[in-house]
Every structure is written in structure tokens, then in C-alpha cells.
Amino acid sequence: SVAVAGAVIKGAALTFNILQ
């Protein structure tokens, strides 16, 4: 669903920011 996709994208972005 759109909500799940949004959550996955947000999670990936958050993880990316933490790893930077």
C-alpha cells in the first residue's frame, strides 16, 4: 500500500541519514 511504501522510504532515509 501507499502507507507501507511511505514508511519504508522514510525508514530507509532515516537509516541513510544516521549512517552518514
Swiss-Prot record:
What organism is this sequence from? Answer: Actinia fragacea
GO CC term (a single one): extracellular region
Q: What else is known?
A: This protein has been found to bind carbohydrates, since it shows a substantial delay in elution profile in size-exclusion chromatography. The carbohydrate pocket ovelaps with the lipid-binding module of actinoporins.
Which family is annotated? Belongs to the actinoporin family. Sea anemone subfamily.
Q: Which residues form the signal peptide?
A: none
> Which terms does the record give in the GO molecular function aspect?
lipid binding; toxin activity
> What free text does the record give on domains?
Composed of a long N-terminal alpha-helix and a core region rich in beta-sheet structures. Before the pore formation, the alpha-helix binds the lipid membrane, partitions into the lipid-water interface and stabilizes the monomeric molecule on the membrane. Finally, it traverses the bilayer, thus forming the transmembrane pore.
Question: Under what name is this protein listed?
Answer: DELTA-actitoxin-Afr1d
